[in-house]
């Protein structure tokens, strides 16, 4: 038995929220997480916050990973947090990635997002965060 065998298998919903069609990054991250033993549910492109939260609750995930490159992060991610609160699902952790300025990332963290991954973040950093970090956040 390895150390990984004694850890919980995390369930993470990944999604592209809004009208952004740039999905290569979220697919690469989703596959890397899956290959690292994380159960990944990829919701797909052009998801609304309502669709993401509904899927997250139905799939009983531990976390939502949101990818945004459209500049709508300060509208869409807070909406996801609001909907989670309305549905009494604040135990679902939210993290994000994409082109998100550092000032906005700090503001999103104040609102409850546990981490924002920017361009150039290594896949191993994201895997380590999911396997070890987000439940401690």
Spans of features found by a protein language model:
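Cofactor-cradling patches in redox/metallo enzymes
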Residues: 26-131
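Intrinsic disorder at enzyme termini
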Residues: 1-2
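Nucleotide donor/acceptor-binding cores
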Residues: 10
């Amino acid at each position: 038995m390895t150390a990984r065998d004694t850890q919980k298998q995390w369930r993470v919903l990944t999604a592209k929220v809004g009208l952004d069609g740039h999905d290569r990054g979220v697919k690469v991250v989703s596959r890397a997480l899956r290959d690292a033993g994380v159960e990944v549910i990829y919701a797909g492109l052009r998801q609304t916050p309502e669709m993401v939260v509904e899927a997250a609750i139905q799939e009983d995930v531990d976390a939502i990973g949101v990818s945004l490159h459209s500049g709508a992060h300060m509208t869409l991610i807070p909406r996801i947090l609001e909907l989670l609160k309305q549905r009494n699902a604040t135990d679902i952790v939210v993290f994000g990635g994409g082109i998100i300025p550092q000032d906005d990332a700090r503001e999103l963290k104040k609102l409850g997002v546990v981490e924002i991954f920017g361009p150039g973040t290594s896949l191993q950093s994201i895997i380590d965060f999911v396997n070890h970090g987000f439940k401690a956040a």
